[in-house]
Design a protein with these regions (language model features):
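Short aromatic/hydrophobic "clamp" motif used to bind/position activated sugar donors
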Residues: 102
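Catalytic metal- and UDP-sugar-binding loop of GT-A-like glycosyltransferases, i.e.
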Residues: 105
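Conserved donor-nucleotide/metal-binding helix-loop-beta segment in metal-dependent transferases, i.e.
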Residues: 109-146
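Short, acidic, metal-binding catalytic loop of nucleotide-sugar glycosyltransferases
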Residues: 22-30
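N-proximal low-complexity "stem/linker" segments adjacent to membrane-targeting elements
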Residues: 1-21
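Active-site-proximal specificity loops/subdomain of glycosyltransferases
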Residues: 46, 51-95
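Short internal beta-strands
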Residues: 32-39, 135
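A glycosyltransferase accessory/donor-loop signature
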Residues: 1-2, 8, 167-315
């Protein structure tokens, strides 16, 4: 059994649904799905293909109602305050004491192959270790890493990426980590760059169990290199996403768009932060012949024109 945790708001519903569906489709294990949502606690927001999926064991959705002082760096960014909700997961998930571990997944991650064995094995290793969290080690250029170390006052150069986290629930509760992380957040509020990821790193200072890259593989939409067959989960890392016009023209956006299509929500998921930029990327994609990478170019043209009439998205 996999215990998955997602935290998101209404602006990220489709992205979250697509990510969740990819895990349900690829996993050989049943999945307990726990959602902390900014706007609702109603299950009827989920598509039927998720609600009736044979791999879904249980779905619990909780509306975030915790009053907190601040959620730094979310204004005018591609990240919402919902990224911070995972700091409070143990206040929401029912019967949390029955869980050995929970795996948090970012909404911009897509499961390509069955990750069950690796998640279960790494969860066991985490529980048997001294660590409370398991994550992939981040790879920064030396200059950037030096800035982060100085900014967060770290003694370790081991900095984790929080896109996929395996959490030892018992250690988290026993060590009162929610309170300690909130205290750390307020201490470093003015130095935060990478949202709650910085909070985790400032508190843990390199003390985490390291996951393989196959469970959190950075997918760069600046090139068209194919992802290795060993990769289980791709992470659309950074602010260039496969549901934006610029991102869709990249071959690797198909991992996301194919799953969105299988979910039954439409042919293409397209959002706009600034329509003028989207139109420019659209025209450039056609003249550069990048449109040949799309499986359904005519459907994309139609969906793009329709999407221009919809409310702009913040992401």
């Amino acid at each position: 059994m996999l215990n998955l945790l997602y935290c998101f708001d209404s602006n990220y519903n489709f992205q979250a649904f697509t990510s969740i569906f990819s895990f349900l489709e690829r996993s050989s294990e049943k999945i307990n799905l726990n959602i902390i949502h900014k706007d609702t606690s109603k299950k009827d927001i989920f598509p039927e293909n998720i609600l009736k999926h044979t791999n879904l064991n249980e779905l619990n959705i909780y509306r975030f109602d915790r009053k907190f002082q601040t959620f730094p760096k979310v204004e005018n960014s591609h990240v919402s305050e919902a990224t911070y909700y995972r700091l409070f997961f143990n206040d929401y998930i029912k019967n949390i004491e029955d869980f050995e571990s929970v795996t948090y997944v970012d909404c911009d991650m897509i499961c390509l192959q069955d990750p069950s064995f690796e998640i279960i094995e790494n969860s066991k290793n985490l529980v048997e270790s001294e660590y409370v969290l398991a994550a992939r080690k981040e790879k920064f250029e030396t200059i950037e890493m030096e800035k982060i170390i100085k900014n967060l006052n770290l003694s370790s150069s081991k900095y984790m990426n929080a896109g996929l986290l395996i959490i030892d629930v018992n250690k988290w509760i026993n060590e009162n980590l929610t309170q300690k992380l909130c205290e750390k957040l307020l201490q470093i509020e003015n130095n935060i760059v990478y949202w709650d990821q910085d909070v985790f790193n400032a508190y843990l200072d390199g003390a985490f169990y390291e996951l393989p890259e196959s469970l959190n593989y950075y997918t760069n939409l600046e090139d068209n290199l194919i992802v290795s067959k060993e990769v289980k989960i791709v992470h659309y890392y950074g602010n260039k996403k496969p549901w934006t016009t610029k991102g869709i023209f990249n071959k690797k956006s198909t991992y996301y768009q194919d799953m969105f299509r299988e979910l039954g929500l439409g042919n293409y998921h397209i959002t706009h932060k600034r329509r003028r930029d989207s139109v420019r990327h659209f025209i450039r994609g056609i003249f550069n012949l990048n449109i040949i990478y799309l499986k359904k170019p005519v459907s994309f043209l139609i969906d793009f024109l329709i999407s221009l009439s919809k409310k702009p998205n913040i992401i």
